[in-house]
Amino acid sequence: MENQHAEIVAVITMKPETVQGGGAPVFVVVDEMELQETSMTIEKIMDASAHEINKETRIIVAR
Amino acid sequence: MGTYLLPVIIGITFGFVARMLLLRTDFRQYPTYPTGRIIHLSFGFISAFIGAVAIPAVLESDWTAVTFLGLAATQFREVRKMERESLENIDTFELVKRGAPFIEGMAQAFESRNYLVMFTALITTLCAVFSFWIGVIGGIVMLVIVKFNMSGKFLSDIADVKEAEIRFEGPTLFVDDILIKNVGLEDTRKTITKQAVGAIVTPKNQNSIVTLSFLGQRQAMLHHVATILGSYLDSGEPALIPLTKRDMADGRIALFFLPREKDFNQIRAVLDKVPILDSAIRMPKEADKSNS
């Protein structure tokens, strides 16, 4: 409940040109279905949660 | 010393009975452990004993014995420390955490119960010195006071609970009109729509707005619901962790959680019975805010 430190552990996107490289790996996918599947896989592996930035991009955030 | 034996025994008995009355295993499931029970009953016995012998010590002008009462208080602070430590250790493995303020409140309760027992034994012995029956009556009166006057306030005293709709606007999860969080996965959104329940807690006055804004109090509500009604949750599923958010404008609290039991009448009954933590009680209304 206290203020936690949050970190982006991965970025999944259909529009790689809108994401600049940084600390987190960027996964490039082709369609909505692959976007959902990849996000889900990474979410489960990292025990983190997926959040929607926009229709094309999801980020995986670990706390 | 023979003259005081009976009063002391009555004092110890009533003190010990008081401790047993206060030690109940309720839905919060603590203290359920047999070892925990033994610890508290023996501490209760010791404090009843200390309380009971205080009066004869005063009557005999044995002042050294009286000062030992002060020493006993230090011992009971240990009870608080012990409770706090064991509850904190357990809390790290809890799916929905109790939170440090809740634990502090429970530890405090355990300490104060020992003082209550000591006080009960003391008063009972004092009465019993005059006559056996006055002692018994005094003891029973103390038991009634201890049992019924020492329970704290509940959430229903300071706020109203009502059911609220869970809905998504795109990726954003709302409980009624209060924003909870952003959910990225279609699958998680489906689970939430199916399993989650929303509740809005509306404070009754200015004091309760401040009390409810306390994060510890909000975590206590979530823990309470999760222990009694279960939760649809596992470790490593941060997307499903129950959350509370506050409407900063009017102080309403939105609760988002995934209980196993979704009947809202039960949920309301459980939420109404959430204890108000001592550390959460704020009374800004009592403060002098005038420009003098």
What are these regions (language model features)?
Chain A
Residues M1-A48:
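N-terminal non-globular leader segments, chiefly Sec-dependent signal peptides
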Residues M46-R63:
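Short, compact, well-ordered microdomains
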